[in-house]
């Protein structure tokens, strides 16, 4: 039995709107707001008049802000919680809104706020207590007589005469009704004077006619009294276990050995107060005795049931581990999706920046990705299977090679996903700029983050996986230097050459081999030289570095692709220290937003109107010169500033005559890398819109074009259009045919034309019947084909695993020199080799990246096999192996050992980003930075 729950309600119905991660943004609906206190926890309960389960929000240590808008009409209050949920209440009574704001402000400060009984509900029009007050005077005498369970009526004041609690239909042991009333009156006075804690009886929670006083203190006393009585009953039973004891008044449930007597009509308060009792002792009709099987008391002297902790409202049971179903040779897709979804920064940037999903086309990959990501942990396998089909269809609409059920390469699928997601974000930014969304609310009532319609949405691929490499080409004849910059989402590295005299090579060796300096054939524009050297350095680092290990080689003699089963060490940490410069930019911070960075960049550009944004080119003292093949950072900022302030061009001319004006350039040194990226995004959006032209429509793939006002109703809208278009087309066809008939017909009157119309109608009906039959037959064939494909998939998986097991001994014996025969080996000094070996376990060197996921290909052939993925779960702080629908726990050492021959794609996260995410997960803090969460529909 729990303590009483004081409640604060809104009285009448109010308009309510909720924004949270589970619902998105709901519409305005009428309902009731209640604030409950239970076990020192305060919750907000929202009940909608339209029905459905009530919504519960925790208020204890969760209130972020309370806003009260006092307008000419009804009052509006906005409650913002720390878990990114927002509850908006409209049409509140002035007094109710005032009291509710005071209470919520008290909860926000962490002070205890409990409703007092002397602050009754009449003071501000709210309801206190467990239920609505009911007037007892409205009950008829027969109603009062037929309520034997209302024993709590005895605790009221004796201002009115009482009716006996017995029912005329039951047999009673009392001689007369009048004498029973006198006995009860006397017992009532004695019990009220001696044992006041029994005045609030247990059956009161079922009594609809009881008063609505706040009974917190009395209920606590009653519970303590019941607990003491239960202890005493257990002690008596333990001292005399074999002696049948009569029903004692100190026993809460009664004696185990007492005979069942349902003919007695006395209530719990009518039991005699003496320790001895006659065999006809009365038993409560509400509280069952111990002989009832389902009311057995646990054999303990210290019963702690009253203080049993209740589960938290926000505490949700962890769902079982489950993967993705195989739709038919789609293991490559499942492995890549699991690796991408395991990246917290990627998931947050995809879901928690408030993308208006209704404005995104239904079949866009961005929307399909977000929908699957949001539902993958809470949906059954059947629902996820359908979501996977939609993701596959969105990919296949652009890349037809992924349609059907053929086996595909996991790296090709990954590259297609990342490129297509980038395109979708660019399209939505462009459509959002050209067609701002209109809200149905006045501007004064919108939230701050809903007003801005010119924002830029951050691309999850750009801020997480994309990095920039600077290629430095140096002419060997004249020393001229040309700089080229190139953006990548991943790197494809070669297998290091394996020899008997060398130890086992690692992924670090392959990465260093990729960035080695090399000689190329190059035609110099200055001296017409034909040879040059090129070196590669990182100019911007990613949060997540994706490495693709080339395990396939083409056999020219057999004209076949073969898989290399060479062992490669998988280090826990990689370092890019030797491939970075002093100007290399670090990964973007977790809270970075393209919109915020662009706003700050534009403010800085507006504050300086006459400064130059171009640095003096630094030429080396040698005879060589430096050319930049891409826009420098200063040029990018210059273009953005020139877009907003065309007068800056004149300032550049003045700068040539007034060198002292260059001092003001230092104000632009505050523009960091993140703001620079925002400037690039803004400039690219502007250039794209200019290049497209006013009459040119943006090109898009089938079913993924942008421009629909409401993608949620897109399917229904298309169905309505098809339904309306069909008879229209028939009429147009009919009109054209009739026109031709009029030109060729003979003047035989109207009868020939009517016969032709009737014949056309019959042909139309026959065609419709044939079409329906063809559709039904195609559906049956599709179902049969899917069943055959499932069987073929099972057989293919079994054969692939069997082939891998049979070829494993051969692989173990033939990998001594199976690496890249034409490649070069990295040569390290002893100190460098020891430093790299130590860093592989500790990650102490700067710009180190930690292993977080491995996609492996199991099988000896490049044309067959099976893909699985091992990922590090940030929330569980453990490694998981995803094999389609099967999920199992594993260890990092096991992954490093078992995937040294089959590892194909490796995901490494920057050490600083990894540690920051780990700390946030341990602290239970959301990494969305308070951004709006809109779930895809």
Curated annotation (Swiss-Prot):
Keyword Protease appears in the UniProt entry: yes
Motif D-box 1 boundaries: 76-84
One protein family per Pfam: UIM
Stretches assigned to the USP domain: 322-911
SUPFAM superfamilies, A to Z: Cysteine proteinases
Catalytic activity: Thiol-dependent hydrolysis of ester, thioester, amide, peptide and isopeptide bonds formed by the C-terminal Gly of ubiquitin (a 76-residue protein attached to proteins as an intracellular targeting signal)
Biased amino acid composition, Polar residues: 132-149, 609-625
Alphabetical list of Gene3D superfamilies matching this protein: Cysteine proteinases, Ubiquitin carboxyl-terminal hydrolase 26/29/37, pleckstrin homology-like domain
Chain segments annotated as transmembrane: none
Catalytic class of the enzyme: hydrolase
Catalytic activity, EC: 3.4.19.12
Motif stretch (KEN box 3): 742-744
Family: Belongs to the peptidase C19 family.
Protein name: Ubiquitin carboxyl-terminal hydrolase 37
Species: Danio rerio (Zebrafish)
